Amino acid sequence: MRNSYLIAIIVSVALGLIVLFLLFPTQPKSAIDKANSPTADSVKIQQAIELVNGPQPMQGIQMLLSMVEENPKNVEAHFVLGEFAIRSGQMEKAVARFNTIIELQPQNTLAYIYKGEALMQMDSVQAALATFNGAIATDSTSGIALVYAGKMNEKLENWNEAKALYSTILRHNEDPIVRDSVNAFIRKIDIKLKNK
């Protein structure tokens, strides 16, 4: 009697599992693989980066250029080309790449920041400030954008604006090292304002 009871339970559980699997279809293996694998573009971009950082930099750049030629909306390829332009001192090309990204993705805070960095290196303080303000408009808590905008305001001797930007960082960042650095910026500005 016990054996038949045990067999009935095992058969019931097995049937329950079979019904469960039949009622809830799973994704085909190829769909799961596709979701977990990087895109072909991402793989190609990674290969190009390795070439640029390795023995064949021009071949890597050519790969990236052909990618944006094939798909002008390939933000990732534009971004990498912009980064390489900054690294190689080609600031005008970098600005153009990041402008393209901003046109395609107006909320891309990082594109504004990189563009602003290129403009800073070109000594285009007003344009850099406007760009960092664009980054802040997309993410009002971006510490990098706030610091850079503060520094540009300092260069333009807009002390109160710089201080306000630095104070914003303090409202959004609890890191003691960051807070100490930002407070040092503010103290420096307070001295400038007192000596005015």
Model regions and ranges:
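Alpha-helical segment of the N-proximal tetratricopeptide repeat
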Residues: 36-76, 80-90
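Conserved positions within tetratricopeptide repeat
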Residues: 61, 95, 129, 163, ...
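Short solvent-exposed coil/turn linkers within tandem alpha-helical repeat scaffolds
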Residues: 70-73, 105-108, 139, 172-177
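Helix-start (N-cap) detector for alpha-helical repeat units in TPR-like alpha-solenoids
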Residues: 40-41, 75-76, 109-110, 143-144, ...
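Canonical tetratricopeptide repeat
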Residues: 80, 114, 148, 181-185
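Long, contiguous interaction/recruitment modules in multidomain scaffold/adaptor proteins
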Residues: 1-43, 53, 66
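Alpha-helical adaptor scaffolds
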Residues: 49-52, 75-138
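TPR/TPR-like (Sel1-like) alpha-helical repeat modules
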Residues: 137, 153-177, 187
